[in-house]
Amino acid sequence: MSKSENLYHAARELIPGGVNSPVRAFTGVGGTPLFIERADGAYLYDVDGKAYIDYVGSWGPMVLGHNHPAIRNAVIEAASRGLSFGAPTEMEVKMAELVTELVPTMDMVRMVNSGTEATMSAIRLARGFTGRDKIIKFEGCYHGHADCLLVKAGSGALTLGQPNSPGVPADFAKHTLTCTYNDLASVRAAFEQYPQDIACIIVEPVAGNMNCIPPQPEFLPGLRALCDEFGALLIIDEVMTGFRVALAGAQAYYGVEPDLTCLGKIIGGGMPVGAFGGRREVMDALAPTGPVYQAGTLSGNPIAMAAGFACLSEVAQPGVHETLTELTNQLADGLLNAARETGIPLVVNNVGGMFGIFFTDAETVTCYQDVVKCDVERFKRFFHLMLEEGVYLAPSAFEAGFMSIAHSEEDINNTIDAARRVFAKL
């Protein structure tokens, strides 16, 4: 047995499923998950000494690559002064100044510890601000594991929420309405059925948890218009897209202004950080200035703030996003060409520094129903064969891939060459 296999066996006796987040268990692709010893630049190194070109990037935060010296040094320096104070610090102010400068729609920002905290707090704030209970989310979009967001859609354009995890009361989930991504008609139907009850829409501007689905041109502006028409707030969940699709996020890339924005992943540079913020009028409703309660023992802790500030300072440098987009385009184009050469039907979606691979005969993949029709079994074989080639992709057909500026053109070319060999075996 490999060291990863031994560790996985031991972990399963002590940790549910052997992992601390389900997708890491390789249940979407089968087999034994890799246990990682270290990472540097564009590469992961497992406990058995094998190296992999990494397109997971810790599920998004590592836009600069692993073990970036600016972030590492900032963490070491901050840790030398103490790990947590439970009191305000200067770095929290500097971080808030930087975030609100980079994302102009955020007049104010509150730091939390995860993307889940950010989305659940933003929804609570929207409900408190509007005095309404219902929310709209989209089929196939993931916004963390808060109870009101673990809801699936049934058939039809509009479905009253039903929980898709035990432990979520049906009475609570019923306030979540699920519509179809990229389908404005389904959203209007929800508002027309509940014109005075919907507090907010929460949406991924690029859906990254049904792989990678960009919005249709009219979709995000249409959501903004519907929120304005019916007096609801628009929450854009940029946990995945923030500072990755563009410096000011997908909202800037697509030209839509939300009332609230949720951030995570890149904002922490690899440390556990989330944030939510937006219009001053809305944020003023948050405790201690307003009645909507939110708190956190480790929120804004100095180590995480130092890492996040260092990361965003690097990400904001000229040319970073142009490089990131160009590398992602090279990979996407190369994979498509390799698939065509070997007769494999493939769609690759990409925006900024994220991408999605779909094995399908369809010409486009634009919503959850398109995604579930793709060939998941072929993806599983592709994943494991690419792993043998030294390329680490997301271990699920429903997760996006992530580029970093640490990836070289040689890394991209090696990945495309590996894919060409793998396609020939599928």
UniProtKB/Swiss-Prot annotation:
It catalyses: (S)-4-amino-5-oxopentanoate = 5-aminolevulinate. Its main location: cytoplasm. One of its GO terms (molecular function) is pyridoxal phosphate binding. It is an enzyme of class 5 (isomerase). The keyword DNA-binding does not apply. Pathway: Porphyrin-containing compound metabolism; protoporphyrin-IX biosynthesis; 5-aminolevulinate from L-glutamyl-tRNA(Glu): step 2/2. It comes from the Bacteria. GO terms for biological process: protoporphyrinogen IX biosynthetic process. SUPFAM superfamilies: PLP-dependent transferases. The modification N6-(pyridoxal phosphate)lysine is found at K265. Its cofactor is pyridoxal 5'-phosphate. Its EC number is 5.4.3.8. It is found in: Cytoplasm. Keywords: Cytoplasm, Isomerase, Porphyrin biosynthesis, Pyridoxal phosphate. The keyword Magnesium does not apply. Homodimer. Belongs to the class-III pyridoxal-phosphate-dependent aminotransferase family. HemL subfamily. This is Glutamate-1-semialdehyde 2,1-aminomutase.
